[in-house]
Each structure stands twice: as structure tokens, then as C-alpha cells.
Amino acid sequence: MQKTELVFPKFPTHVKVSKTKFMKLGYNKLYAGVNHFVREKIVKQVHEYVDAHIPKGLDISTPIGTHLHIYAPINFGSVRMVKGKLTWKPPHDRYKPNWDLDNLAFIWLKSLNDGLVKANILPDDTVEFLTSTSYTIHFVDDFEDRKLIYEIIHEQ
């Protein structure tokens, strides 16, 4: 089975929602009570990041599946934006993660799928062309090593 990998280094953790305010990216925050204008602003910033990292002229046959590999520290849930600056400290030895992978993965999966359509790589992200998607977390020791690897799995 042939695969194409797209790498998205140092993916954004927060997006700017006003001059001085940032919001951490997450599916729950995006769709649970956020004003639709703010939601549009957030989605636009995520799409801009995705669009900048999708190679031009990528040619794939459909249908495809996708798999998102998320590389992030085990304590990714404790990443904060303070006065416009990201803050993170390595976890202590007995740290137990308490954040949901789904909240991080869903927003990226949707944006990456949309990015393939926008780049004319995929005609549409309906089940006719995109038949499966999944995701996995891989823990890294340093926050600066965070990245997304989006595998396009050629099903034919």
C-alpha cells in the first residue's frame, strides 16, 4: 500500500482571536459556545497554516484514507499562552496526562482534509473520495519537537 506523508512542523497551539487575546486550539472550544465570527477567525488561521504546508502539484488517485500522527509532549494540555508567548515546562516524573486526544486531532483532521480539497488534490472530502481516517499520538520530550505527520494512504 502506497503512502504519501505531509509534515506540518511546530503546529500552532493557539490562535489570535483579538488584539490581545489568544485561544488554545481544540475541538470542544471551537464548537461549544464560541461566537460564529470567532469560529471563522480561528478556522481561517488554521487553514492558512495548513495551506502553507501542502505541496503544490501533488497528484493522488482516489479513494484514499488518511492517518494523522500527532507528535506532542505528554503534558500538551498544560501548554499556555501568556501575554502572547507560549509557555511550557517539561512534566515531572509522575505526571498523568488529563487532556483528550480527540479535541486536538479533530480540528486538524478536518482542516487537513479541507486543505487537500482546496489544493485540488482531492475532488471532495466526501466518502466517495476519503473512505477512512484515524490518528495516533506520539509523545516527544520537548515541546519544540511537536509536529503533525499526515499520511495519505492510497487505496488503489
List the model feature ranges, each with a label.
Residues 1-156:
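Catalytic phosphate/metal-binding cores of nucleic-acid and nucleotide-processing enzymes, i.e., regions
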